[in-house]
Design a protein with these regions (language model features):
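N-terminal beta-strand motif that seeds the catalytic metal site of vicinal oxygen chelate
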Residues: 1-15, 72-77
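Short, solvent-exposed coil/turn segments
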Residues: 1-3, 37-39, 47, 68-72, ...
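Core segments of cupin and vicinal oxygen chelate
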Residues: 9-51, 56
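Vicinal oxygen chelate
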Residues: 13-14, 75-108
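Helix-adjacent hinge/juxtasegments
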Residues: 55-56, 63-78
Length: 108
């Protein structure tokens, strides 16, 4: 068995697409748009074959995100070494992203 892909709804579809391309080396398809529902998505492919679908619908509600709750926990990406993680973290901070936690070698 193989997980084919993970799908995430995002607020800013183009911003999310550009983030994964710039920082994590994703390759993107041309995108999908259903004009009847205004659903839009991109499939992003990564070097090891993993795929992520990012999606957007106009009627999605952006609810507050609580850290301590059941359900979806996280998605983890490997960039190959601790040095690459540290360099990517520094680049993200320099580009104005908040680093909420980490980088870490293990969770919990």
């Amino acid at each position: 068995m193989k997980i084919e892909h993970i799908a995430l709804y995002v607020e800013d579809l183009e911003g999310a697409r550009n983030f994964f391309i710039k920082y994590l080396g994703a390759k993107s398809n041309e995108g999908y748009h259903n004009p009847q529902t205004d659903f839009r998505s991109y499939f992003l492919s990564f070097e090891d074959g993993a795929r992520l679908e990012i999606m957007q619908r106009p009627e999605m509600v952006n609810l507050p995100k609580e850290a301590a709750r059941t359900g979806y926990a996280h998605i983890a990406f490997s960039v190959g070494s601790r040095e690459k993680v540290d360099a990517l973290t520094a680049e993200l901070k320099a580009d104005g992203y908040d680093v909420v936690s980490g980088p870490r070698i293990t969770g919990d």
